[in-house]
Amino acid sequence: KNANTEKEQMEAKSSAKVLCVVGISQAIMFGIMHYFILYSSWIQANAGGEHAVIDIAKVSCILCGIIFIVLGNFMTKAKRNAVVGVRTVWSMHNDNTWRKSNRFGAICIIITGLLTIITTVFTSGMTGTIFMLIYLLLATIVTVVYSKKIYDKEIKK
């Protein structure tokens, strides 16, 4: 679908930038994970060890936490679209509900990233993964509920 108005063109450019950041962030994350897997395997092969030296789950959780923080900072920059951001029926109602929902969602994702990093540093990788999923689920639920509340306020105006 082609962007007809100048506003739609600006929104499309903004969304494209956010998608680019998402793609680059994921590529970096998987590249670092790949490096740690190869490095751990090399250490293990040379030492004749039976257990991995590096807990890849721990590295993955910390990287995911960093990605959440980065993406949370870019979430507020995305204009209303069908690809990036908090996309509920309520948040898509108008630009105001979109902006408020995505700002709140971004804060939740940043907090999720911080909590994931902190938790993973002090626990094992698998425990960190479980906590990360719990934090992400809670952030999603709270953001969707907030999106509905913003929508309800907007309808009453």
Question: What are the roles of these predicted feature ranges?
Answer:
Residues 1-157:
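Feature 926 captures the class I aminoacyl-tRNA synthetase adenylation module centered on the KMSKS loop
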